[in-house]
Each structure stands twice: as C-alpha cells, then as structure tokens.
C-alpha cells in the first residue's frame, strides 16, 4: 500500500485515532499511539456515548414502570439504587473498552501504545513526557492529532464557588439529586436532563 514503511504517530487513543491506526497498518505503516490518560478509548466509550446511552436506557425503563401506557398492567414507582446502576454501567464500559480498543493493541504488533503527554519539537519529531516520569523522542513520517474533546465550562459568574457538574460527572454521579439545574440545551444537556428527571430529580433547564 501507499503507507508501506512509513512511521506514523497518532496523538490520542479514541475512536478516530484507532480508525486511523488500523487504516495506516492496513496500508503497511507502523503506528505509535500516544495517550496521556491512564485508560485508552477516548471520550465515546469512557465518558460519552456508551455510558450516556446506558444511563438513558435505564432511565427509560424507570419511566415505563411509572408511566407505561397499557391498561391492565399495574404502574408503580421504581426504586432507584443509583450505586448499583453505576456499577453495572462502569462494568459495561470496561467490557466495551477491552473489546473495541485494548484487544486491538494486544492483537496488532504494528501498533504500539505509549502513555504520556506529547509535544512537537519540529514537523517530524515528537517529545513525550511519559507518565512514569521519564521522557523520549519519536521521529515520524506522518503525525495525526486525534485528541478528541473535553467538557467546556461557560463563563458564569460564581460558577467556581458551587459544586457544579460537567457532563462526565453527571454520568458517573453516585446519587440522584433532588433538584438538578442544567445550563444549556444541547443534545448532551437534554439527554442528561431527561435521564435525571426520569430517575427522580426535579430538573430545570436554563
């Protein structure tokens, strides 16, 4: 393929990074993947799509128990054990991360993972501050930045003085709050708002 013999560095280890790594290897390249977090997989499997869909589905079932539309089937208020729900959610996330990401590294000798923070020295050289406290330099023919996303905090006066959640903290909270205020109305905001409402919180969207 067109990538035969190329040394490729990919900064990040999410779905985009792995898709690029597999394609590069398919074309004959050798890939070094750099990830500064202690776990691989990026946003979707760890703190995004996967845990959110698990929580949304659980909340939907709670809602159906309370408000299903069929006469002759008794409706009842669900008993929510958030910690047990969360333990199952985390276990499923771990399972999918192993299946979709960790197993690829284990089965592919042409993809190497380095855990540390990357910085550019020049167009073809990456310096890596390794998580173990050491450092190394990597030279590459191609470098892909696939560092993904992180929650953005709005510039709201007084926000730093209150125990706010970002989307990740909302997905992994151990308790259902009595009242949740959601600032914003994006898809993520409304999904979280609906889930918490169905699990028993009073929810206000601003």
Residue positions per predicted region:
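Glycine-rich flavin
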Residues: 1-5, 23-176, 204
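Beta1/beta-strand and adjacent pyrophosphate-binding region of the FAD-binding site
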Residues: 2-14, 176-186
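N-terminal Rossmann-like FAD-binding beta1-loop-alpha1 element of flavoenzymes
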Residues: 6-33, 189-198
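Gly/Ser/Thr-rich beta-alpha loop segments that engage phosphate groups in nucleotides
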Residues: 14-16, 43-44, 50, 150, ...
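An amphipathic alpha-helix/helix-turn recognition signal
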Residues: 15-19, 84, 113, 184, ...
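Rossmann-like NAD(P)H-binding beta-loop-alpha module
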Residues: 174-206
């Amino acid at each position: 393929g067109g990538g035969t013999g190329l040394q490729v560095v990919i900064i990040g280890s999410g779905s985009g990074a792995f898709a690029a790594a597999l394609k590069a290897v398919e074309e004959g390249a050798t890939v070094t993947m750099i990830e500064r977090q202690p776990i691989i997989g990026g946003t979707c499997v760890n703190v995004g799509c996967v845990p959110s869909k698990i929580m949304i589905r659980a909340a939907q079932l709670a809602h159906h128990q309370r408000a299903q539309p069929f006469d002759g089937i008794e409706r009842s208020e669900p008993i929510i054990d958030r910690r047990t729900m969360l333990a199952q959610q985390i276990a499923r996330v771990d399972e999918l991360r192993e299946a979709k990401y960790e197993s690829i590294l284990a089965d592919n000798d042409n993809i190497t993972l380095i855990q540390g923070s990357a910085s550019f020295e020049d167009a073809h050289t990456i310096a890596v501050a390794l998580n173990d406290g050491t450092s190394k330099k990597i030279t590459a023919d191609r470098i892909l930045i696939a560092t993904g996303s992180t929650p953005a905090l709005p510039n709201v006066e007084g926000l730093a003085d209150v125990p706010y959640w970002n989307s990740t903290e909302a997905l992994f909270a151990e308790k259902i709050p009595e009242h949740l205020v959601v600032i914003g109305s994006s898809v993520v905001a409304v999904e979280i708002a609906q889930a918490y409402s169905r699990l028993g919180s009073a929810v206000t969207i601003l």
